[in-house]
Curated annotation (Swiss-Prot):
Binds 1 [4Fe-4S] cluster per subunit. (2E)-4-hydroxy-3-methylbut-2-enyl diphosphate binds at residues 41, 75, 129, 167, 226-228, 270. Pathway: Isoprenoid biosynthesis; dimethylallyl diphosphate biosynthesis; dimethylallyl diphosphate from (2E)-4-hydroxy-3-methylbutenyl diphosphate: step 1/1; Isoprenoid biosynthesis; isopentenyl diphosphate biosynthesis via DXP pathway; isopentenyl diphosphate from 1-deoxy-D-xylulose 5-phosphate: step 6/6. Isopentenyl diphosphate binds at residues 41, 75, 129, 226-228, 270. The active site is at 131 (proton donor). The gene is ispH. Signal peptide: none annotated. One of its GO terms (biological process) is terpenoid biosynthetic process. This is 4-hydroxy-3-methylbut-2-enyl diphosphate reductase. It comes from Azobacteroides pseudotrichonymphae genomovar. CFP2.
Length: 287
């Protein structure tokens, strides 16, 4: 192996970086800070922050604490969570990503404009993802969530359709869903689609395709529960079949590097830079 390169564009997106910085800032002056859910979908980064004093809680536990500081992560929260926090005199440190927050407001505004009209909000995203749960909450739980074009039978085509996307989905999949719905729409039903996929995500997909073909072997670093990690890894794999998904250096197998001259290391928007650097150092014995 001659070269090891870490993708300069991989690592935390703006929203995740901001949430982590806010947590670290609070932990400098406070011994105790709660976070509602994992602050990022990467277990190594969560453990690092837990060692500094961050305490991860779930929604049930939020209902049982009072007068505490709680960080709401970049994925956002539904209105019901804010109600519980306010009732319990929780000091909220709101680290909702600005892109997600703007999307929440847009969905809520359109939903509230429905009044008695026959209309529906449809969300393209992972049904169990925290961001999607928060978005559905903007519609009092009435939004329809579809994970692929195969799910569009859940849509009521007798009602107007307003389609949005989770910010970390694959734009080509969103476009396919738009086409499928357009083919089924019958006048006078209204169909409006809003491509709400984050531009950072789109740019990373384009960049990672180029990065992948520059190396003999790719190590893609991501947590098992990273939604954008799955998408970005699949794009890497399409561009370079010699791509391996790892969560840390323990997943690496020495036989991967036989005859390999160039290794690229990249990751999800939830993958810390320090972890990719640690993995790069672990490859030195294979030189």
């Amino acid at each position: 192996m001659k070269t090891i390169e870490i993708d300069c564009d991989s690592g935390f997106c703006f929203g995740v970086m901001s949430a982590i910085q806010r947590a670290e800032k609070e932990l400098i002056t406070n011994d105790e800070l709660y976070c509602l859910g994992d602050i990022v979908h990467n277990s190594q980064e969560v453990v690092r922050l837990q060692k500094k004093g961050l305490k991860i809680i779930n929604h049930e536990e939020l209902g049982r604490i009072y007068n505490k500081k709680v960080l709401f992560r970049a994925h956002g929260e539904p209105p019901s969570t804010y109600e519980v926090a306010n009732q319990n005199s929780i000091h909220i440190i709101d680290a909702t990503c600005p892109v997600v927050l703007q999307l929440q407001k847009k969905i809520q505004k359109i939903y509230q404009s429905f009044a008695n009209t026959k209309s529906q909000i449809v969300l393209f995203g992972r049904s169990k993802h925290a961001e999607v749960s928060a978005l559905v909450g903007q519609t009092n739980g009435n939004a329809i969530v579809i994970e692929s074009k195969n799910d569009i039978q859940q849509i009521d085509f007798a009602k107007n359709i307003y389609l949005f996307s989770q910010t970390t989905m694959f734009v080509d999949d969103f476009k396919e869903i738009v086409k499928e719905i357009e083919n089924k729409i019958i006048h006078p039903i209204i169909f409006s689609s809003f491509n709400t996929i984050c531009h950072q995500m789109v740019n990373r997909i384009n960049h990672i395709r180029k990065f992948a073909v520059q190396h003999n072997l790719l190590l893609f670093v991501a947590g098992d529960n990273s939604s954008n990690g799955t998408i970005l890894f699949n794009e890497c794999r399409r561009a370079n079949l010699n791509t391996y998904l790892i969560s840390d250096e323990k997943d690496i197998q020495s036989e991967w590097f036989n005859g390999i001259k160039s290794v690229g290391i990249c990751g999800a928007t939830s993958t810390p830079k320090w972890l990719m650097e640690k993995i790069a150092l672990s490859l030195i014995p294979f030189h």
